[in-house]
Amino acid sequence: GKKMSSRKGGVFRTIELIDEIANAIEAQFENSDHEQAQKLAISALIINDTKGDISKDVNLDIPTMTKMNGDTGVYIQYTAVRLRSLMQKLNEEGTSNFSNTTLQTQFISPLQKKILFEASLLPLKIKTSLELLKPHIITQYLLNLSGLLNRWYNDSPKAVDMKDEERKQNLLRLHSILIVFEKTLKLLHMPRVEKM
C-alpha cells in the first residue's frame, strides 16, 4: 500500500484519491460507468478507513481495496445489489404482499437463523461503537453480515423453484434484513449503487 507522511509531502487530496480508486475500479470492471465507479470508490475508501481500529495505521492498498470479495466496500456494495436483485425477483414471482405473513420457523435454515440473529445485533453494535468511540465495530458488523448473506444467496434455491409459502417467507426475511443492511450503509455514509 501507499505510505503517507505529511512531513515528506506524501499527502493526497481526498478527491484525487477517490479518482485514483475509481480509475482502478473502471479498469477492473468492464461494465462500470464513471458515476458507479465513483460510488464504489467512495465505498472502498470508507470501508478501508473504518474497518480497523482508529488507533492503528490505515494502509491504502488500492488493488486490495477494490476487490470484489473480502473486507472491501466493493464487496459490501455487491452484496447490497444482490439482495435488492433477489428481492425484485421474489416480488416478480407474485409475493409482494406479505403484510399478513408471520415468520414460520419450518422455513428457516440454520444459516438463516444466524443471519437473522446477526441482523438483530445492529442496535447493540451502534451503542457499543458510540460508547467506545470505535467505528470499526459497525464496519466489521457489516462485513460479517455481508459474508453471511452471500453464503445464503449462493446456497438458496432459485426464487422460481420455491413454493409460494417458502417464497413469501424468504421475502419477509429478506425484506427485514435489507432494511438493516441499508440502514448500516447509510450509517457509514456509503452511497447507493444500483447495479454491478
Identify what each model region corresponds to.
Residues 2-196:
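Non-catalytic interaction-recognition regions
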